[in-house]
């Protein structure tokens, strides 16, 4: 089934674009990683479409959604409000009581969890796929009293800001990127989807990233503005928390969040940060296994150890 593109208006004046795979099944709402777009989640969406009506949004500043000026147009709370507006519109048009599955990759996982914390019961269950969880001040002090732990976000933001936004063609971007470690880890079709939908055509014949470098950098720099540790106790839905075994995010922060979430199951598969683009089959396997667990049976926050998949 080919998805159709839709647009949802928010009370903040944003228009959020989305890819809708259609059908009358329970809804799975997907949120991509920073710098990506909803179309890049197609490999996961297509595999889930037998069980769910899958809708993958473009966050503001990404894909074909509204792109206000940075940095002021990108408060982290705005991403949560945008996603909630789309979820509520879908519930209104279908008559469903809850979104069956909220699935977020990287920063999308934080956005999904914060939306559930704000509006308890919005989701039947959620999945956070290697979300950017960094130690807060208290955890950082406990892990390293000497103060040697350095927050990587300013450096990552600076790197994103230097990214080349305009290219002669998609072919030139492909040639420059295809051997870089991040893109080599992706499934070939995921890379092609990013080239196709992550760029827009310009009138001068060149192509330009839809997610501007200053937008991506703003999100990296301010991703800690959403206090997921404080919000965790308000997340009533069962949570699948996935830490990428080959990722670079601190395991201690994941373990801390696991303890704080009321109903959390954690998995540590041997895969890199962008699971849906690198390992869509494994990603769907993890999602389906968690979906098969009765909603009330997710591991309690104080019980069980992280396991591998």
Positions of PLM-derived features:
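Catalytic histidine neighborhood in serine/cysteine hydrolases
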Residues: 260-273
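Conserved hydrolase catalytic core segment
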Residues: 98-143
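Alpha/beta-hydrolase fold catalytic core
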Residues: 1-29, 49-52, 92-96, 133, ...
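Helix-rich cap/lid subdomain of alpha/beta-hydrolase
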Residues: 138-206, 220
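Conserved serine/cysteine hydrolase catalytic core
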Residues: 189, 198-259
């Amino acid at each position: 089934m080919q998805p159709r593109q839709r647009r949802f208006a928010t009370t903040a004046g944003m228009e959020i674009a989305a890819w809708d795979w259609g059908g009358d099944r329970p809804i799975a709402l997907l949120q991509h990683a920073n710098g990506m777009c909803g179309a890049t989640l197609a490999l996961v969406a297509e595999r889930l479409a037998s069980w769910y009506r899958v809708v993958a949004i473009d966050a503001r500043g990404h894909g074909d959604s509204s792109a206000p000026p940075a940095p002021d147009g990108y408060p982290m709370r705005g991403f949560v409000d945008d996603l909630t507006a789309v979820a509520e519109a879908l519930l209104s048009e279908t008559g469903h009581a809850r979104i069956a599955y909220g699935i977020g990759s990287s920063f999308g996982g934080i956005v999904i969890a914060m939306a559930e914390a704000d509006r308890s019961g919005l989701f039947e269950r959620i999945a956070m796929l290697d979300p950017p969880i960094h130690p807060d001040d208290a955890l950082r002090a406990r892990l390293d009293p000497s103060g040697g732990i350095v927050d990587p976000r300013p450096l990552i933001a600076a790197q994103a800001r230097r990214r080349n936004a305009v290219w002669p063609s998609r072919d030139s971007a492909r040639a420059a990127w295809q051997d870089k470690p991040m893109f080599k880890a992706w499934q070939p079709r995921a890379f092609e989807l990013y080239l196709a939908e992550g760029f827009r055509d310009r009138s001068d014949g060149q192509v330009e990233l839809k997610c501007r470098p200053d937008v991506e950098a703003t999100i990296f720099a301010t991703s800690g503005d959403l206090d997921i540790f404080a919000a965790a106790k308000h997340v009533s839905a069962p949570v699948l928390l996935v830490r990428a075994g080959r990722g670079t995010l601190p395991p201690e922060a994941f373990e801390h969040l696991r303890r704080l979430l009321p109903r959390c199951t954690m998995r540590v598969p041997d895969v890199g940060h962008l699971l849906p683009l690198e390992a869509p089959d494994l990603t769907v396997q993890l999602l389906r296994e968690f979906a098969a667990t009765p909603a009330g049976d997710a591991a309690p926050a104080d019980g069980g150890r992280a396991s591998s998949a």
